[in-house]
From Swiss-Prot:
Gene (UniProt): CCD7
Span of chain positions assigned to the transit peptide in the UniProt entry: 1-34
Organism of this sequence: Oryza sativa subsp. japonica (Rice)
Biological function: Involved in strigolactones biosynthesis by cleaving asymmetrically a variety of linear and cyclic carotenoids at the 9-10 double bond. Produces one C(13) beta-ionone and the C(27) 10'-apo-beta-carotenal. Strigolactones are hormones that inhibit tillering and shoot branching through the MAX-dependent pathway, contribute to the regulation of shoot architectural response to phosphate-limiting conditions and function as rhizosphere signal that stimulates hyphal branching of arbuscular mycorrhizal fungi and trigger seed germination of root parasitic weeds.
Gene knockout outcome: Dwarf phenotype with increased branching and tiller number, and strong reduction of the root levels of strigolactones.
Cofactor note: Binds 1 Fe(2+) ion per subunit.
Protein name per its UniProtKB record: Carotenoid cleavage dioxygenase 7, chloroplastic
Sequence similarity: Belongs to the carotenoid oxygenase family.
Compartments, as annotated in UniProt: Plastid, Chloroplast
A Pfam family matched in the record: RPE65
One GO cellular component, as annotated: chloroplast stroma
Keywords linked to the UniProt accession: Chloroplast, Dioxygenase, Iron, Metal-binding, Oxidoreductase, Plastid, Transit peptide
This enzyme's EC code(s): 1.13.11.68
Disulfide links within the chain: none
Length: 609
């Protein structure tokens, strides 16, 4: 495929400072990358190898400037509708990838850069602000707030300009993955450490929020689910290995005993926040611990449930229904050669793990949400094997309904990719030997089949909880291209939903056919039909977030960021959810000042005022 020719392309780069920012924004020593004159001229054409390479890399260009005082954004198309609710759209993601000493890190290891878009419907304006999350790692790596020296490896990176051999600073909590407003607090989360609390108006970092400590203080709400265990000798061996690993992981690599996942769930029916944590040693042992926490609107612990699953799994996202927590297990294994290379510092620490494709099915664990469900159901430690090998990426929704057998029908709407494509430290095309990302990894020849796509998992349980049928199919036959970041109207979480929205590929660019996404697809799961809105030219889009206004399931607006990388611009886009697929779906587009253009965000959150 032609995209394979992108990999060896390495054009010269020139560093220069940003233009002066607006008065109310704080400017650090900004650096951005541009092509040489020859490369820039070639990239002027939309669909060339050069344009594809530079557009892709500009999507992950560092932004060192912060906007401490909010500024109004200029409307470039349309207008803010009068029925748009007052509230704030928060977007988490990395802000910086390269330091001043020659190191470039994986996008997943970039320091958290929180963006805020505050809607004031009274005066029909949107105010923007942005700040780095002041984590302990950020304060160490940028002591004066201007210059940067990366000292932490992070799980996915190798420091070209920093200490490699003997560098045990692996757990680099960058608070860059997701953002949550709950119980009067705004939290930035990362896959493996404490959340950081941030002031919801000023975005000033308050400090780490000890969520697990808060839960441990109320352990009388904890219940341990029982399950059939392995032979006692095997279990004793795993227990001994865990006891040996914990002090090493904690004392040497500074890993917390439990790592909180960055993906959370909100149960609107019960008014609860649901979160899950894993044990640190689970990454290295063929056994997985999961602790689920449920908090009320005041951040008081309502319930805590613990499960031990006899499988070596990696979980990024998960689901829940009225009676179950649901894990779609991504099977992994320890990579011994990779582990040795990782310990030397010459390979990323994540190289110690590899996908385990030996089984051609996907384990689905239905974990009872209450002791009552556990008492009346199946052995939850035995997974339901979905008849398709897939790597679970993100979950849009899950729900359950009573069926004619006296049991339950469970449905999940999610994105998944192929084990054949998924590669831990090559995600986004990262290669620690080079300072540029390789677009061809995310645009592989078999990308249409291998990259994330939208699927439905359907499970039929009888009255005893036994699985009678499990199936996996595309969510829509009309849209078979890669798609991810599934979202729904949050009012319909944990109940039957009709619509799913996701970032998607239109396939309009020959050399970037699959990623980055350039469209939003709206799937009607009742009939499998699909409609979409696409940006034009050399532009990409991020995760869609639904803002409900009433008037039915699709009564509301879809927010997303458009990255016009060739023009060094970002726009906040407002779509009418009902009109996606028509010419007038675009309601408004607002421009972020050029000097504040930011790299691709990961996950966002809408909070009503």
């Amino acid at each position: 495929m032609a995209t394979q020719a992108i990999a060896p392309m390495h054009a010269a780069v020139v560093h220069r400072h940003h233009v002066l920012p607006p008065r109310r924004c704080v400017r650090r020593r900004g650096v951005f990358v541009r092509a040489s004159a020859a490369a820039a001229a070639a990239a002027a054409e939309t669909d060339t190898l050069s344009a594809a390479f530079w557009d892709y890399n500009l999507l992950f260009r560092s932004q060192r400037d912060e906007c401490l005082d909010s500024i109004p954004l200029r409307v470039t198309e349309g207008a803010i509708p009068p029925d748009f609710p007052a509230g704030t759209y928060y977007l988490a993601g990395p802000g910086i990838f390269s330091d001043d000493h020659g190191s470039t890190v994986h996008p997943l290891d970039g320091h958290g850069y929180l963006r805020s878009f505050r809607f004031r419907p009274g005066d029909r304006t949107i105010h923007y602000s942005a700040r780095f999350v002041e984590t302990a790692a950020k304060r160490e790596e940028s002591r004066d707030g201007a210059s940067w020296r990366f000292t932490h490896r992070g799980p996915f990176s190798v420091l070209q300009g920093g200490k490699k051999v003997g560098n045990v600073k692996v757990m680099k909590n960058v608070a860059n993955t997701s953002v949550l407003r709950w119980g009067g607090r705004l939290l930035c989360l990362w896959e493996g450490g404490q959340p950081y609390e941030v002031d919801p108006r000023t975005l000033e970092t308050v400090g780490p929020f000890d969520l697990l400590g808060l839960a441990a203080a109320d352990d009388n709400k904890a219940t341990n689910a029982s399950a059939a265990r392995r032979p006692w000798l095997q279990e004793a061996g795993l227990d001994a290995a865990a006891r040996l690993l914990r002090p090493v992981l904690s004392g040497v690599f500074d890993m917390p005993g439990k790592r909180l996942l960055a993906h959370y769930k909100i149960d609107p029916r019960r008014g609860r926040l649901l979160m899950v944590a894993c044990n640190a040693e689970d990454m290295l042992l063929p056994r997985s611990h999961f602790t689920f926490y449920e908090f009320d609107a005041h951040f008081d612990l309502v319930q805590k449930r613990e499960f031990v699953v006899p499988d070596h799994l990696m979980i990024h996202d998960w689901a829940f229904t009225d009676t179950h927590y649901i894990l779609l297990g991504n099977r992994i294994k320890l990579d011994i050669p990779g582990s040795l290379l990782a310990l030397t510092g010459t390979h990323p620490m994540i190289a110690a793990l590899a996908v385990d494709p030996r089984r051609q099915s996907t384990p689905v664990y239905l974990l009872p949400r209450s002791p009552e469900t556990e008492a009346g159901g199946r052995d939850w430690s035995v997974p339901i094997e979905a008849p398709s090998q897939m790597w679970s990426v993100h979950v849009g929704n899950a729900f359950e309904e009573a069926n004619r057998r006296g049991g339950l029908d469970v449905r999940l709407h999610m994105s998944s990719c192929s084990y054949q494509w998924f590669h831990f430290h090559r995600m986004f095309g990262y290669n620690w030997h080079h300072k540029k990302l390789d677009p061809s990894f995310m645009n592989a020849a078999k990308g249409k089949e291998w990259l994330p796509r939208l699927v439905q998992v359907a499970i039929e349980l009888d009255r005893t909880g036994e699985c009678r049928r499990c199936s996996v199919r595309r969510l829509s036959d009309q849209h078979a291209r890669p798609a991810d970041f599934p979202a729904i109207n949050p009012s319909y979480a944990n109940q039957r939903n009709r619509f799913v929205y996701a970032g998607a590929a239109s396939g309009s660019r020959r050399f970037l056919p699959y990623f980055p996404f350039d469209s939003v697809v709206k799937v009607d799961v009742s009939d499998g039909s699909a409609r979409w809105w696409s940006t034009d030219g050399r532009k990409f889009v991020g995760e869609p977030v639904f803002v409900p206004t009433g008037g039915g399931e699709d009564g509301g607006y879809v927010l997303l960021v458009e990255y016009a990388v060739s023009k060094h611009r970002c726009h906040l886009v407002v779509l009418d959810a009902k009109k996606i697929g028509t010419e007038n779906a675009l309601v408004a587009k607002l421009e972020v000042p050029k000097n504040l253009t930011f790299p691709m965000g990961f996950h966002g959150f809408w909070g009503d005022e």
